[in-house]
């Protein structure tokens, strides 16, 4: 069967996403676009994948990703979670560290997911803008990267949201949700279906007691 591009973006970009396990259907539904834009790290204009940050019907920000993985955003844009509209009316929410991970969860059927726009940075601004949306969530699943930056973000998120409202998603076949998807969608689904509760201060389990005895 002949390959066809059903999106409004170029074949090369669509094929890049395909290599990362992201389908054309997800690209269309998540409104991924393509645009020439100045990349400060490259000191020139270049073609970019564009992740569009909507808040309601308003496009508040764009994040631009070049072919060599340089990133930039619109200047002075209001900070919001990527995908904030997708948790409207939800009681559970998955939080990831990057737009590709948000798309990975969408691909696996988990649409109630948001991504921080800039790691552990700018969280004050993001929470200020999106506080009303977050206060309606009963349970958060922290699905950030398995590295030092991810641990920093994880700590910042559970401190803000409350450890008792959060569970951790662990990825065993890579550092993040997109790596897990590339391994297989079943691997990603397995990780998402097996969250780990954070121990709350003042509580302990049998292993803790046994360690003390030994």
Which residue ranges define each predicted feature?
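Acidic, metal-coordinating catalytic cores used for nucleic-acid/nucleotide bond scission
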Residues: 120-123, 144-154, 173
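Conserved beta-strand -> loop -> alpha-helix junction used to position metal-binding or nucleic-acid-contacting
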Residues: 166-179
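Acidic beta-strand-to-loop metal/phosphate-binding motif
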Residues: 93-95, 134-149, 169-170
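Structural alpha-beta junctions
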Residues: 113, 159-169
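Short, aromatic/basic amphipathic alpha-helical patches
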Residues: 130, 152-163
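Short, surface-exposed amphipathic charged segments that create phosphate/polyanion-binding patches used
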Residues: 46-48, 128-135, 176-192
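Phosphate-handling DNA/RNA-contact segment within nucleic-acid enzymes
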Residues: 38-138, 154
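TOPRIM metal-binding catalytic domain and adjacent DNA-binding surface shared by DnaG-type primases
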Residues: 1-56, 75-91, 193-213
């Amino acid at each position: 069967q002949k390959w066809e591009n059903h999106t409004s973006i170029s074949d090369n970009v669509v094929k890049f996403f395909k290599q990362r396990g992201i389908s054309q259907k997800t690209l269309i539904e998540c409104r991924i676009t393509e645009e020439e834009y100045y990349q400060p790290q490259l000191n020139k204009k270049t073609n970019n994948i564009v992740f569009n940050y909507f808040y309601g019907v308003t496009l508040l920000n764009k994040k631009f990703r070049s072919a060599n993985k340089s990133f930039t955003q619109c200047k002075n844009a209001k900070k919001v979670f990527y995908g904030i509209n997708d948790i409207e009316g939800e009681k559970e929410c998955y939080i990831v560290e990057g737009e590709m991970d948000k798309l990975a969860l969408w691909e696996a059927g988990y649409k109630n997911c948001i991504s921080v726009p800039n790691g552990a940075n700018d969280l004050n601004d993001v929470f200020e803008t999106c506080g009303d949306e977050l206060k309606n969530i009963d349970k958060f699943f922290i699905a950030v990267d398995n590295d030092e930056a991810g641990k920093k973000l994880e700590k910042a998120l559970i401190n803000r949201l409350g450890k008792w409202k959060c569970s951790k998603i662990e990825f065993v076949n890579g550092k993040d949700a997109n790596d897990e998807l590339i391994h297989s969608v079943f691997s990603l689904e397995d990780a998402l279906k097996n969250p780990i509760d954070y121990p709350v201060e003042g509580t302990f389990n049998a292993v803790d007691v046994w360690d003390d005895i030994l």
